């Protein structure tokens, strides 16, 4: 089933049942790149606990979207919760809070693949982008927890 809602995904998620975020088998998005003022001031009080890995910088909301997407996929190994997200290349390299969140995602063994795409792919920006694939079945206790590899694809040429 497909459910679409209009709203502010980070400040006021619309896909909820009761007081819980809805869970999905697959979540795919192309969120706004490096969104400024995404709601960092409110993240520490998030009623859904999405930012337990850390709060991304106020001026860069990329990891806020990534974290939200991961937290809305199934953890159950039989449900295969997967995430595909298009991000600016900076998401792969920036330090500080973003570096700590990225490290946590890697330590959780969630990152499955990184696909580097060329610059000028989008008409609205010339920066290179990447597709990140996360797989919840790789978590401890999951069906693919023994997989520790990450597939890197250079599709930038």
Q: Where do the model's predicted regions map?
A:
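A conserved structural/catalytic subdomain of Rossmann-like adenosyl-cofactor enzymes
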Residues: 6, 11-13, 17-157
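Conserved SAM/SAH cofactor-binding pocket of Class I
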Residues: 1
